[in-house]
């Protein structure tokens, strides 16, 4: 019985290590794509962002994150309003992450530890970014769905991007009585300002 139990634990361990390496390799490739875009002086700022936005949209669970962040306003919205909101949120997310990664593009980084949250079926990958003044840790939360990996959250110094966005959006939604359609107008204007700031 002990041998069987040990063998089972060994299989789980080997399986996680293989999967963990797959996730780390995948994530590292996507990070390199983003950082390389910023370091490419032949690309305009606009083209850099569009390239990064495409990478983020393909690899982040944008729709699921958008729904979570919308909170109670989601249920009362029409299908058309929801689709508009998801599109706006994905751009908002891309602008936020692009702005953050732009600040790190000239710094060295290393993917360090990885662990698996069995309960939530999520892999957590720690990334350390080094600068002259010290280092900062980012934790990527990655989930596999339909044989693909998707980032479902980003923790900067243990602060969740998704939870922060939900709190931020809730404050903004309050001002429009949790009307997602009205909120879309505000989000669209905010995206336009962030976009102009990023590409100029």
Language model segments and positions:
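Sec-dependent signal peptide recognition
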Residues: 2-9
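N-terminal signal peptide c-region/cleavage motif recognized by signal peptidases
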Residues: 13-17
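Short, low-structural-confidence N-terminal segments
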Residues: 18-23, 199-200
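Early exported N-terminus immediately downstream of N-terminal targeting peptides
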Residues: 22-101
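A mature extracytoplasmic/lumenal domain signature
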Residues: 89, 115, 129-131, 142-144, ...
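Surface-exposed, charged secondary-structure patches
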Residues: 95-139, 190-200
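Short beta-strand edge/turn micro-motifs at domain boundaries
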Residues: 137-163
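Low-complexity, intrinsically disordered terminal/linker segments enriched in charged
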Residues: 156-200
């Amino acid at each position: 019985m002990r041998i069987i139990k040990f063998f089972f634990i060994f299989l789980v361990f080997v399986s996680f290590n293989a999967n963990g390496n797959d996730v780390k390799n995948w994530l590292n490739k996507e990070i390199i794509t983003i950082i390389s875009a910023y370091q490419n002086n032949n690309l305009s700022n606009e083209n850099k962002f569009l390239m990064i936005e495409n990478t983020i949209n393909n690899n982040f669970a944008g729709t699921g994150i958008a729904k979570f962040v919308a909170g109670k306003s989601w249920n009362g919205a029409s299908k058309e309003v929801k689709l508009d909101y998801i599109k706006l949120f994905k751009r908002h997310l891309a602008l936020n992450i692009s702005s953050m990664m732009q600040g790190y593009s000239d710094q060295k980084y290393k993917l360090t530890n990885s662990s698996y949250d069995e309960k939530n079926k999520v892999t957590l990958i720690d990334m350390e970014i080094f600068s002259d003044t010290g280092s900062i840790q980012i934790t990527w939360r990655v989930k596999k769905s339909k044989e693909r990996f998707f980032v479902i959250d980003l923790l900067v110094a243990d602060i969740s991007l998704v939870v922060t966005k939900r709190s931020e959006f809730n404050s903004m939604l309050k001002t429009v009585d949790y009307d997602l359609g009205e909120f879309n107008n505000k989000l669209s204007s905010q995206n336009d300002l962030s976009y102009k700031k990023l590409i100029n």
